[in-house]
């Protein structure tokens, strides 16, 4: 009897976390099925230490998230942005057999010695072909500019709307950050009939903490499965801080390129920069055509100081504004000011 009581006590007191799908997520990847592993305990999100973390644990996680088969166990520190210092490591180790339906069914060990340098990561095959990489995965449509409008997400090269059920200012903050549009503006505005979407409603019950880098990092209800109507489409308004200038040249149409973000001017790294990007800048400034300056000419304006805001900018050349081009997250780069972009336009 004593042995039976001890066994029952051990089972009932084994540490665990929420078994619902919203209690587990992957953060920082190109889609919702890869990234740093985070779990929820008592309403707080935290990371999992990689002690003993292996492909069997990832297999269970991928199954729980509906992300197909496990494809890898990358380190969690590879994903940006990194876990915040105040965010706790909640689980020391997870030990799954690989047959469980959720991580909550696996053996877990409470944290005693682990830092964010040891955060676990996971990569799944993701048969749903989730969101495209940032910034193409989300947009604000039918609004007065790039930073106001109906929220739409991209799935398999089609745009779909998002139901406002479960939507919050925290989710709006994520969208505005993802689009490089500054802070989210608190608004009670809803889509009018003219701004209703016509595509299927893809997401509902968004549950963002506000710290996510992209909307696809936020837990949500099942994709494509909801009871919403288009009069419940989500509308978001952000500050629109995007502006650019050329400094250090003889006129307003030549110089080192700087962009305005969050009220601060910063430079742009020249990784992948070329003639198409020059064309968009000249077009936006009303400065005629790009003169495609030589490497030497580009360097004559000197390095900037302060922030480097953009890196890996990619334009097709058809954009009307640099904000419509693809780029890394604002502020993320591997550059120095010796790589600052300079542009010379015909004027």
UniProtKB/Swiss-Prot annotation:
Keywords: Apoptosis, Cytoplasm, Disulfide bond, Glycoprotein, Immunity, Inflammatory response, Repeat, Secreted, Signal
Localization: Secreted; Cytoplasm
Post-translational modification: Not N-glycosylated. Probably not O-glycosylated.
Signal peptide per UniProt: 1-19
A UniProt-annotated Pfam family: SRCR
InterPro entries: SRCR, SRCR-like_dom_sf
Protein function: Secreted protein that acts as a key regulator of lipid synthesis: mainly expressed by macrophages in lymphoid and inflamed tissues and regulates mechanisms in inflammatory responses, such as infection or atherosclerosis. Able to inhibit lipid droplet size in adipocytes. Following incorporation into mature adipocytes via CD36-mediated endocytosis, associates with cytosolic FASN, inhibiting fatty acid synthase activity and leading to lipolysis, the degradation of triacylglycerols into glycerol and free fatty acids (FFA).
Protein name, UniProt field: CD5 antigen-like
């Amino acid at each position: 009897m004593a042995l039976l009581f001890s066994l029952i006590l051990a089972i009932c007191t084994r540490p665990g976390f929420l078994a619902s799908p919203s209690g587990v997520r992957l953060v920082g990847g190109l889609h919702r099925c890869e990234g740093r592993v985070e779990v929820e305990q008592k309403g707080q999100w935290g990371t999992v230490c990689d002690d003993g973390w292996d492909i069997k644990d990832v297999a269970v996680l991928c199954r729980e998230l509906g992300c197909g088969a496990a494809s890898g166990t990358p380190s969690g520190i590879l994903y940006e942005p990194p876990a915040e210092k105040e965010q706790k490591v909640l689980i020391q180790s997870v030990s799954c057999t690989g047959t469980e339906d959720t991580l909550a069914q696996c053996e877990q060990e409470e944290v005693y010695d682990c830092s964010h340098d040891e955060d676990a990561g996971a990569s799944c095959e993701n048969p749903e072909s989730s969101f495209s990489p940032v910034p193409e995965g989300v947009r604000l449509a039918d609004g007065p500019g790039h930073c106001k409008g109906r929220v739409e997400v991209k799935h398999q090269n089609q745009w779909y709307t998002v139901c406002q059920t479960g939507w919050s200012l925290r989710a709006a903050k994520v969208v505005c950050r993802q689009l490089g549009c500054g802070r989210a503006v608190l608004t009670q505005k809803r889509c009018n009939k003219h701004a209703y979407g016509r595509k299927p409603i893809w997401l509902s019950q968004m549950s963002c903490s506000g710290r996510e880098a992209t909307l696809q990092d936020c837990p949500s209800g099942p994709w494509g499965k909801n009871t919403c109507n288009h009069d419940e489409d989500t509308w978001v308004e952000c500050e629109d801080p995007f502006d650019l200038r050329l400094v250090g040249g003889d006129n307003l149409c030549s110089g080192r390129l700087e962009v305005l973000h969050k009220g601060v001017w910063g430079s742009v790294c020249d990784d992948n920069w070329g003639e198409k990007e020059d064309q968009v800048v000249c077009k936006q400034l009303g400065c005629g055509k790009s003169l495609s300056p030589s490497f030497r000419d580009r360097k004559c304006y000197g390095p900037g100081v302060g922030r480097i805001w953009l890196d890996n900018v990619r334009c097709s050349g058809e954009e009307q504004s640099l904000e419509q081009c693809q780029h890394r997250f604002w502020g993320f780069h591997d550059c120095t000011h010796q790589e600052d972009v300079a542009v010379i336009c015909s004027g």
